[in-house]
């Protein structure tokens, strides 16, 4: 168990990096990060909203509602069962991605890289014409695996926003926006203000994930600004 925990924390490539050093170590670091991103991307491309709407309903969720292949549109179109299965699948692929990435290149470099790849895969899936969802559930599960304390704060912001406004999109945007701020603060505190490559890498990945989720909500943000955004409801619109 100690060996597994150590490999998860540092990554399989770490032992080779320690024994080589120099340019070879840098190459192994970059290779591990790239491999983690690629694995995360292809796992993330498994879009469960599209899989379930196709298998269970012989349909394409992107034809209905917001045209988004995600949990909220599945809820509005097919109901809570379909939405629950969607969020479970979209979160599970993020969990698997982070675990694999961590074993490859350690929790910081591998885990965060795989998480980023998974969110990109969900938003731009290779298997579905690069037209996927907005990455909220996938990003949430990735955050949980990367830093459970950050997840609790992000979840709190999301839930409070949705309870007060009933706008899923607003809660998603606010939750995404606060994630890189929490990540920056966490590693700044751990490192006591010193430049720490792993911490800065984690912050940059968190920032990219947040920006990706927020940009994918640009239409929702526009509707919110004009008071035209749909509020969340448990009622489905399609029989």
List where the protein language model places each region.
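Interfacial segments of multi-pass membrane proteins
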Residues: 75-78, 101-104, 117, 121, ...
């Amino acid at each position: 168990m100690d060996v597994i925990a150590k490999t998860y924390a540092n990554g399989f490539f770490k032992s080779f990096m320690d024994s080589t050093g120099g340019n070879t170590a840098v190459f192994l670091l970059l290779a591990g990060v790239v491999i983690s991103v690629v694995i995360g991307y292809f796992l993330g491309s498994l879009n469960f909203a599209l899989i379930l709407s196709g298998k269970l309903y012989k349909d394409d969720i992107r034809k209905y509602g917001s045209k988004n292949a995600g949990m909220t549109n599945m809820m509005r179109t097919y109901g809570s069962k379909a939405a629950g299965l969607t969020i479970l699948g979209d979160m599970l692929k993020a969990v698997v991605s982070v675990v694999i990435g961590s074993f490859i290149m350690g929790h910081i470099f591998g885990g965060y890289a795989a998480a980023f790849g998974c969110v990109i895969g969900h938003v731009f899936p290779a298997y579905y014409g690069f037209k996927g969802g907005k990455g909220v559930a996938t990003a949430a599960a990735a955050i949980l695996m990367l830093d459970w304390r950050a997840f609790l704060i992000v979840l709190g912001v999301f839930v409070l926003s949705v309870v007060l406004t009933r706008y899923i999109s607003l809660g998603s945007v606010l939750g995404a926006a606060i994630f890189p701020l929490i990540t920056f603060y966490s590693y700044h505190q751990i490192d006591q203000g010193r430049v720490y490559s792993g911490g800065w890498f984690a912050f940059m990945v968190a920032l990219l994930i947040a920006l990706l989720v927020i940009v994918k909500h640009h239409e929702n943000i526009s509707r919110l600004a004009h008071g035209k955004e749909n509020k969340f409801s448990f009622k489905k619109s399609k029989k």
